[in-house]
From Swiss-Prot:
It comes from Zea mays. On the 2D-gel the determined pI of this unknown protein is: 6.0, its MW is: 38.0 kDa. This is Unknown protein from spot 75 of 2D-PAGE of etiolated coleoptile.
Length: 49
């Protein structure tokens, strides 16, 4: 499931804080690359099969 994939991603990159935004925002994930700077990616970009 996507939740499992997210957990695996977090475990693989523990230094990156990520927050899953609400579905009404298009299922974006915000990665805090470094303090004060976040990069946004679409959920589907991260977990495509």
């Amino acid at each position: 499931x996507a939740d499992g994939a997210m957990i695996n991603y977090v475990e693989a990159f523990p230094h990156i804080k990520c927050t899953v935004l609400a579905p009404e925002f298009g299922a974006y994930v915000a990665f805090e690359v470094y303090p004060g700077f976040s990069e946004y990616k679409e959920w589907s970009e991260l977990f495509t099969k």
